[in-house]
Every structure is written in structure tokens, then in C-alpha cells.
Regions:
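Function-dense linear segments that define catalytic or interfacial modules
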Residues: 50-164
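Conserved, charged catalytic cores of large soluble enzymes
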Residues: 1-74, 166, 170
Length: 170
């Protein structure tokens, strides 16, 4: 509780789960195997914890790196705590979210024109933020400037769907 945890799994791990195989737990510092466990048992523990308290989140390492938009820059090894930003080590992302309910008219219509306009404005704002940001290290500043890491998302989709009359299980 009061933390945000993720577990990163590879396709090899998922295959070990499917095949009732064993899985080596690797120490991050020295790369040595510290324990070998039943993959399915570990998967069950991860799944139960996620069901019980919404943590850990899952990150699919193989897919993340297969879909990597800048693979020549290196592997994607980590994310920010909420996992909405996954990119190269020594980068930072300036994040913003737009509240979708602000684009809902009283009659229930979604204001696409203003949503598109706000998206353009926020993209420019985030671009300026990258140029003005004070990053914690020179390496992070250089890579963030080079790759222009912007993150524009949306919030309150649940509220928008409820206001439109969609039930949670639809």
C-alpha cells in the first residue's frame, strides 16, 4: 500500500507459465541466479496480488522492446512509477493530461474540435517545457532534448463513459 509497483515479464517467462516450467530469479546487481521457482506459482502470486490490491502492474518486456520507436537508442529497461512513460534510460518525460469531461457538452456530445485544439496547444506547451526544464542530470537533459520526450494523455475517461450511460462492464 502507498506505493506503485510493477513486475516486468518476458515472453520466455509467459511460456514457462504455460508449460509449467521453472523460472530463474536473477539478482539485478550481479546477474546471478538467486533462486529457481515454479513459473506458474510465481504467476499465481503476482495475479492474486494484482487482484487483491491493484499491484503489481504488469509490464510486458518483450512487447515493449519489440514496439520500441527508437531501438537504435538502446533497450527500454524501466518506466516511471505509473508506467505511462517507458523509454530509454537517462530520459525524462514532461507529462500532462486533459480532463475529458471538459469536452462534453450538456447534451452529451463530445467537442472534437476543441479537443483537437487543446491537443495542439498542449503539445506546443510540452515542447516549450522540454526546452525550459531543469533536469536532474546532464545526461537526462541531453537525451530528453535529443528525443523530445513529451507525454500528453487524458484523464476522467471513466466519468465520461458513465455520463454517456455506459456501464463499467460494457
Amino acid at each position: 500500500q502507498n506505493s506503485n509497483n510493477s513486475v516486468r515479464v518476458s515472453n520466455d517467462f509467459l511460456e514457462a507459465v504455460e508449460n509449467d516450467g521453472k523460472w530463474d530469479l536473477i539478482q539485478r546487481i550481479n546477474g546471478k541466479v538467486c533462486e529457481t521457482v515454479e513459473a506458474r506459482s510465481l504467476w499465481d502470486k503476482i495475479s492474486h496480488a494484482a487482484w487483491a490490491c491493484a499491484d503489481p502492474g504488469l509490464q510486458y518486456d518483450t512487447t515493449i522492446n519489440e514496439w520500441h520507436t527508437c531501438p537504435k537508442g538502446g533497450r527500454i529497461d524501466a518506466s516511471n512509477p505509473c508506467s505511462e512513460y517507458m523509454f530509454l534510460d537517462d530520459t525524462a518525460c514532461n507529462l500532462a493530461s486533459m480532463n475529458l469531461m471538459k469536452f462534453r457538452h450538456e447534451n452529451g456530445d463530445f467537442d472534437i474540435d476543441n479537443f483537437e485544439h487543446a491537443t495542439r496547444l498542449w503539445t506546443i506547451t510540452l515542447e516549450i517545457a522540454v526546452m525550459m526544464a531543469q533536469f536532474p542530470s546532464k545526461e537526462i537533459a541531453i537525451r530528453s532534448y535529443d528525443y523530445r520526450t513529451l507525454g500528453l494523455g487524458y484523464a476522467n475517461i471513466g466519468g465520461l463513459l458513465m455520463a454517456a450511460g455506459y456501464s463499467y462492464d460494457s
